[in-house]
Amino acid sequence: MAVETRARVTKGKAKGIDACADDRGIIRAAAMDQRGSLMRQIGQQGGQATPASLTEFKTAVTKALTPYASAILMDPEYGLPALRERAPGTGVLLAYEKSGYDADPENRMPDVLDHWTVRRLVEAGADAIKVLVYYDPFDDKDLTDRKDCVLERIGAECAAADVPLFVEPLAYKKGLDERGLDFAKAKPEAVKAYMAKLSEPRFRIDVLKVEVPVNMAFVQGARANTTGQVAHTKAEALRHFKEAADATTKPFIYLSAGVSDDVFRESLEWAGESGARPSGVLCGRATWLEGLPVYAKQGRTAFDAWLHEKGVRNIQMLNEVLDRVAQPWWTVYGGRAAVSA
């Protein structure tokens, strides 16, 4: 993996990333920025689909899990009250994109929150800014260029505020079901291409929050493969992990993308086996989703009990895998001394 120069990381950006990492430089972040989809799921499970319920859910997760996390990713719309319950020393990433902006399945143009700017997010307590963008590097050039322009503007905003930018690209391809076999076959090259593209200096991205490059449900020999359908052998999957990691010159962390905690841990183990070295994770639903029906049907007290038993165990097991496979975020920038604030 190529090494960036010290000039790539300003004092403020290094300080912000450090705030989101542990003392070893590993980012062990919990994700709790879901909004519309989470509210719908609470309602579907029999709970009250209200803003108050959403904030209460976020508060419960934050209070229970941040003692075991280095940072929490939150939205500024419903989640700011929850941040008051985070464990001391927990870093804060705030989401800048609108919830549900991907309703257009063709273009999926990114859109930021109407009443927020990077500076306002920092004033609200953000150590780092996170933006999600649906990205097909092989799509129509005009569409991709428009998305690039949005990311460049956000990168400039973050540079002006001297705050780190975490970008979460999600691969998609028009006409394909992202949960299906055909997309699983196309996904690795899309992930490699966007990891290379978004490493370009013009974007001023500091950390990439990326998908694992394969859908483990279609990998031969993976525990997640319960159908027998195969897009990749294990050897091919390991090669994709390593090639995607080698495609970027930025620190990268893996997102759980809604899979179970067991599937996500297996993904990280395979990444380590391949030689890919993430600098951590930003894990949300894999940690707490199984407890959502408990909250919806039985309420906060029962959910608290579930979180302190199963939720904490999930994040502890994830941390054990990270201890084996992750490298400090500053490694690709030339080491701790090169980015010391």
Task: Spell out what each predicted region is.
Residues 78-83, 137-160, 215-225, 231-242, ...:
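Active-site-adjacent beta->alpha loops and helix N-cap segments on the catalytic face
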Residues 125, 181-210, 271-281, 287:
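Structural recognition of alpha->loop->beta junctions
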Residues 132-141, 169-184, 209-227, 251-254:
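Active-site-proximal beta-alpha loop/turn segments in soluble metabolic enzymes
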Residues 1-139, 204, 229-230, 250-251, ...:
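Alpha/beta catalytic barrel-like cores
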Residues 71-76, 130-134, 140-143, 187-188, ...:
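Catalytic beta/alpha-barrel core
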Residues 114-170:
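Hydrophobic alpha-helical segments and helix pairs
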Residues 7-8, 139-149, 180-192, 256-266:
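Active-site glycine- and acidic-residue-rich loops that bind
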